Amino acid sequence: MRSGVIAQKVGMTRVYNDAGEHVPVTVLRMDGCQVVATRTVEKNGYTAVQLGAGQAKVKNTSKAMRGNFAVANVEPKAKLAEFRVSEDNLLEIGTELKADHFAAGQLVDVTGTTIGKGFAGAMKRHGFGGLRATHGVSVSHRSHGSTGSRQDPGKVFKNKKMAGHMGQTRVTTQNLEVVSTDEDRGLILIKGAVPGSKGAWIIVRDAVKSAAK
């Protein structure tokens, strides 16, 4: 098990394959992705690497974090993430990961925070059909209807699909294909959509279920 990477979402475009078919891709850019710290079994009880990416202003970095970056001899990072790795894949502090960490055709799992939509109704949030447009229905055309309870059990069960805050949740999309990489510009092109807005930080790992596919 090896480390993943931290990348920033640039946006979407399309590329053409050898058959002349266009493939929609999401462009991810790697910006100074370095190993900031390591975790070992002897000291921490598990093996992992902590990566940092992007650039943070020194004045916006806490004194404790400035000390950590100074020990690692790296510039302050805007985003940190920890990856569990096997002992033989433990990287040295200061090691920089490039876009060629992944290969074209490889499957990856991508984690990001979805775009927030605010407070949304049941029709938009869960795809409910709503009530009738006429025949006695007034005001409640887009309501979710009954919450499905009576004297017993006398409550609404948890996780009942209702109106509420939509989006802005941490989501992992599995088994996305790496179309190509550009080491010089630090770009990774991934087939399909990736959760998050433009400029969002994205975690990219080797797919864990690719063997089943």
Swiss-Prot record:
GO terms for cellular component: cytosolic large ribosomal subunit. Methylated by PrmB. Transmembrane segments: none annotated. Keywords: Methylation, Ribonucleoprotein, Ribosomal protein, RNA-binding, rRNA-binding. It comes from the Bacteria. The keyword Cell division does not apply. The modification N5-methylglutamine is found at Q151. One of its GO terms (biological process) is translation. GO terms for molecular function: rRNA binding; structural constituent of ribosome. The keyword Hydrolase does not apply. One of the primary rRNA binding proteins, it binds directly near the 3'-end of the 23S rRNA, where it nucleates assembly of the 50S subunit. Part of the 50S ribosomal subunit. Forms a cluster with proteins L14 and L19. PANTHER family: 50S RIBOSOMAL PROTEIN L3, LARGE RIBOSOMAL SUBUNIT PROTEIN UL3C. Belongs to the universal ribosomal protein uL3 family. This is Large ribosomal subunit protein uL3. The lineage of its organism: Bacteria, Pseudomonadati, Pseudomonadota, Alphaproteobacteria, Hyphomicrobiales. The gene is rplC.
